[in-house]
Regions:
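A short SAM/SAH-binding and catalytic strip from SAM-dependent methyltransferases
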Residues: 97-111
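Conserved Class I S-adenosyl-L-methionine
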Residues: 164-236
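Class I SAM-dependent methyltransferase Rossmann-like catalytic core
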Residues: 3-20
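Class I SAM-dependent methyltransferase SAM/SAH-binding core
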Residues: 45-86
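Conserved alpha-helix/loop element of class I SAM-dependent methyltransferases that forms part
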Residues: 18-35
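Conserved class I S-adenosyl-L-methionine
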Residues: 35-44
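Conserved beta-strand signature within the Rossmann-like core of class I S-adenosyl-L-methionine
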Residues: 119-132
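Short alpha-helix
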Residues: 143-157, 161-163
Length: 236
């Protein structure tokens, strides 16, 4: 994802309003080894990294986007380290105890990275739906879905466990104009746009005077757990 000041502001508002990242962290936590050093790969602005910290010794948050990492650095807590660069080249001195790939990367790529950088479990969080939610028209998510991930793991003979769950990640807005900017920012359709009336029809009453409008979004997700020892060298 290409981050901008506006997209970061939208996400921080949504994260503050919902327990989305906390919910994901709570699903991962029971499967983490004790005193673990984990990597949040493709961390973005690090909201999940911060939510994971109570369940482990240290979190290394990695993303290639400089603005995203600068945003995380401005809100760091003890036990979280932010690193800016390509996951492929930013290998740790010692292998991570676990790695989290939340809505990040092709499954084939994550398996390759994890095999080189992790000695324990990897957690792949994928969208459990097939089309982009904020676009005009029907825009496919392509290979970044649960079905695609399952196909890759099965084809390579890699055992895994899977857990489906939902987490509310709606977007609060300070104005209708902000909602229009949001849909313009996240519309992936090349030929269609939503009208003001269509946007307004998707909104509900917001939670406060500061945020009078709200876009509900109960996000269907799937958590795949894979042991790196089960990833054969020939599969990567």
């Amino acid at each position: 994802m290409f981050w901008t000041e506006e997209s970061i502001a939208f996400l921080r508002d949504a994260a503050a309003m919902n327990r989305y990242y906390e919910t994901i962290a709570e699903r991962i936590a029971p499967q983490l080894p004790e005193n673990a050093h984990i990597c949040d790969a493709g961390c973005g602005i690090g909201e999940l990294s911060l939510a994971l910290k109570p369940y482990c010794r240290h979190v290394t948050a990695v993303d290639a986007d400089e603005l995203a990492i600068k945003t995380l650095e401005a809100h760091l807590i003890e036990g979280v380290t932010a690193r800016c660069g390509d996951m492929e080249t930013l290998a740790p001195e010692k292998p991570y105890d676990a790695m989290v790939f939340c809505l990040f990367g092709r499954t084939q790529d994550t398996l390759r990275i994890a095999k080189k950088q992790c000695r324990g479990r990897i957690f792949l969080v994928k969208r459990d739906y097939s089309h982009h939610r904020f676009s005009a028209g029907k825009v496919s998510l392509g290979e970044y879905t649960v079905g695609s991930t399952e196909n890759v793991l099965r084809e390579k003979g890699i055992p895994y466990t899977v857990e489906r769950f939902t987490a509310e990640f709606g977007q609060p807005f300070r104005s209708l104009e902000a909602a229009e900017r949001f849909f313009a920012l996240y519309n992936r359709s090349r030929s269609e746009t939503l009208s003001k009336d269509e946007i307004k029809a998707r909104l509900t009453v917001g939670p406060s005077a500061e945020f009078p409008y709200y876009l509900p979004h109960e996000k269907a997700l799937c958590l795949f757990t894979v042991e790196t020892t089960d990833i054969p060298e020939e599969a990567i």
